[in-house]
UniProtKB/Swiss-Prot annotation:
This is Maltoporin. Involved in the transport of maltose and maltodextrins. InterPro entries: G_neg_Bact_CarbUptk_Porin, Maltoporin, Porin_LamB, Porin_LamB_sf. It is found in: Cell outer membrane. SUPFAM superfamilies: Porins. The keyword Transmembrane applies. GO terms for cellular component: cell outer membrane; pore complex. The lineage of its organism: Bacteria, Pseudomonadati, Pseudomonadota, Gammaproteobacteria, Enterobacterales. The record marks Y143 as: Important in sugar transport. HAMAP family: LamB. Belongs to the porin LamB (TC 1.B.3) family. Homotrimer formed of three 18-stranded antiparallel beta-barrels, containing three independent channels.
């Protein structure tokens, strides 16, 4: 008994050391932004986004606290074979109080197995919820190729002239299909699962410093037995993507062309939508009808222009043409130059313009937005974070159309459709006005 008791402190110390080593091996990554702002005409900070545009210029124009907290660990390794477990919990609140409760979103929980297939060295097998090979424009927070969700796949297969990746993911729509509930009345409360099958060929070196990535995504509604799609629903669709990435001026330029059909046009990023119905006030259902096509031409990048200047930029044209004439044409162009006073202090300006034309009315909405920010950041790159900035933003807009959400779909045939700003004596869109805001914000990724 004496020997056992003497060994106990040593056993505890060894166990603590092992647990400490394991704890230190956990990878902690994430993203967060938060701050405080005011509006020139009074009240809390307002943010500005053009009606019909799918994003906004974000510098000095974010009104929420948002965070993603990622924990992951390599849980097994033998030679070059390994298993990695990855998780991500995200949340967003209105940024108006000390205590703001919200339900977190469990966005990632997956396992990735590397080099598990002997005849496919360098490849990765994965399954679970995952941010899957996302492509975005940072300065407008716009994801143009993103099939994230629960799924499985095999990626980075070396085919000699590039890397091949195969994946299947899922998203769902509330009320997407129906069955008879009682008295021959359709019940729209069931969710419809939308599956996406993704094939990508990346890292093809086609010119000095330049690579090409090609992708095809097919999305379709996957109905339960004895269910039917609502009338006019879009059952499936395709998205084709070509992206050229060029190393230039210590940075990069990406040129992207995308074409989508039917259910892949609404979000335009690779997730299928359109098989479902939406609910206004949780009472009346209206169809999401997006049969048609989408064309997107996009150029964006980040470059260094000497020791003291960096710049982000974006230019995009997007045409969503729907059979029901409720599509849009969206042009956007913007720049974010940065002047570095010291390795940790800079002045940043962002200038952005959006123009959105309604297919149904032919009218246009436009907005100019400019932000000037003084910033302190952890490094001398435009990508350096964390950053603390104080900013002032001015926006001016003129909107000639908006979406009609008055009443409900049972009595309003225009519900959810684009209408002129003064339709039927009403007021749709944001009109013709301007505003300025100011505040402070932190942003970090790690």
């Amino acid at each position: 008994m004496m020997i056992t008791l003497r060994k106990l402190p040593l056993a505890v110390a060894v166990a603590a050391g092992v647990m400490s080593a394991q704890a230190m091996a956990v990878d902690f990554h994430g993203y967060a932004r938060s701050g405080i702002g005011w509006t020139g005409s009074g009240g809390e900070q307002q943010c500005f986004q053009t009606t019909g545009a799918q994003s906004k210029y974000r510098l000095g124009n974010e009104c929420e606290t948002y965070a993603e907290l990622k924990l992951g660990q390599e849980v097994w390794k033998e030679g070059d074979k390994s298993f990695y477990f990855d998780t991500n919990v995200a949340y967003s609140v209105a940024q108006q109080n000390d205590w703001e409760a919200t339900d977190p979103a469990f966005r990632e929980a997956n396992v990735q197995g590397k080099n598990l297939i002997e005849w496919l060295p360098g490849s990765t097998i994965w399954a679970g919820k995952r941010f899957y090979q996302r492509h975005d424009v940072h300065m407008i927070d716009f994801y143009y190729w993103d099939i994230s969700g629960p799924g499985a796949g095999l990626e980075n297969i070396d085919v000699g002239f590039g890397k091949l990746s195969l994946a299947a993911t899922r998203s769902s729509e509330a009320g997407g299909s129906s069955s008879f509930a009682s008295n021959n009345i359709y019940d729209y409360t069931n969710e419809t699962a939308n599956d996406v099958f993704d094939v990508r060929l990346a890292q093809m070196e086609i010119n000095p410093g330049g690579t090409l990535e090609l992708g095809v995504d097919y999305g379709r509604a996957n109905l339960r037995d004895n269910y039917r799609l609502v009338d006019g629903a879009s059952k499936d669709g395709w998205l084709f993507t070509a992206e050229h990435t060029q190393s230039v001026l210590k940075g990069f330029n990406k040129f992207v062309v995308q074409y989508a059909t039917d259910s892949m046009t609404s979000q335009g990023k690779g997730l299928s939508q359109g098989s479902g119905v939406a609910f206004d006030n949780e009472k009346f259902a209206y169809n999401i009808n997006n049969n048609g096509h989408m064309l997107r031409i996009l150029d964006h990048g980040a470059i260094s222009m000497g020791d003291n200047w960096d710049m982000m930029y974006v230019g995009m044209y997007q045409d969503i043409n729907w059979d029901n004439d409720n599509g849009t044409k969206w042009w956007t162009v913007g720049i974010r130059p940065m002047y570095k006073w010291t390795p940790i202090m800079s002045t940043v300006m962002e200038i952005g313009y959006d123009n959105v034309e309604s297919q149904r009315t032919g009218d246009k909405n436009n907005q100019y937005k400019i932000t000037l920010a003084q910033q302190w950041q952890a490094g001398d790159s435009i990508w350096s974070r964390p950053a603390i900035r104080v900013f002032a933003t001015y926006a001016k807009w003129d909107e000639k159309w908006g979406y009609d959400y008055n009443g409900d779909s049972k009595v309003n045939p225009n519900y959810g459709k684009a209408v002129p700003a003064d339709f039927n004596g009403g007021s749709f869109g944001r009109g013709d006005s301007d505003e300025w805001t100011f505040g402070a914000q932190m942003e970090i990724w790690w």
